[in-house]
């Protein structure tokens, strides 16, 4: 019998539990569900395994508090960290979650140095950078979940605006995973027709699209304000699954993710949301879009925001220099 891929989920909160459920339903691989809180991953694993009997899934799920159980993982998704609460920006979490990420990175380096790693923990662009520097993994094997989620929000709002199926919408969001992200209407389409062309046809207006762009930028904050006790987890989990599946199945999908740039877009040694091709070797290629002067200015502003955040935690990162 062919052995299933081993997928470890670091963090068993709302996103971690949802990830485990989706992986089980899609039968992408056997799961290790890790958390520092005793009983939580074990309880969720048992619940999910019982749910799997109803769905007909034979996926094995192990709950654990021991990092050694992630040994030999093919892929790891990291959600561990403090979640956002009302009034908090993603960036408010930086100090606490940097410490958590350093611990996770050390254990990934020790037990699963060949894994493909997807980081979800906020502030995303900084946390995935910490993971790279502290783990020493190759940059093509460490990415952050950002643009797929941001684009999913943009897709929904555009589908509602144009009254079409979400399956007809394909949007593009670049930059940091924060309030300065750059939703690109020019690279977003409805069944292949660019948004600016649809505006010219009278199907929407520049004003409406700008409102949608602003709502997309605040998409996570809108959910935090409504929930009051936490942040989004269904869409972030679904976004990470799309990235994971492209890696495990060598689908070579082009997805917008936080990728480590080494000169692309004029950016050096930073994680920024850009389109990348994901296959069995990890990041196969960074896709460089031709941006207008206005788009490039917005992108550069977003990059500067990421740089400033990195500066605030560089003393905590041993490999920064």
Curated annotation (Swiss-Prot):
The region annotated as signal peptide is none
A Pfam entry, by short name: Ldh_1_C
Q: EC number(s)? A: 1.1.1.37
Enzyme class per UniProt: oxidoreductase
Q: Where does NAD(+) bind?
A: 11-16, 35, 97, 120-122
Task: Name the residues that bind substrate.
Answer: 84, 90, 122, 153
Catalysed conversion reaction? (S)-malate + NAD(+) = oxaloacetate + NADH + H(+)
A single MF term (Gene Ontology): L-lactate dehydrogenase activity
Q: Which domain of life is it from?
A: Bacteria
Supply the PANTHER family for this chain: L-2-HYDROXYCARBOXYLATE DEHYDROGENASE (NAD(P)(+)), L-LACTATE DEHYDROGENASE
Q: What does this protein do?
A: Catalyzes the reversible oxidation of malate to oxaloacetate.
Family classification: Belongs to the LDH/MDH superfamily. MDH type 3 family.
UniProt name for this protein: Malate dehydrogenase
What does UniProt list as this organism's lineage? Bacteria, Pseudomonadati, Pseudomonadota, Alphaproteobacteria, Rickettsiales
* Gene name, Swiss-Prot/TrEMBL: mdh
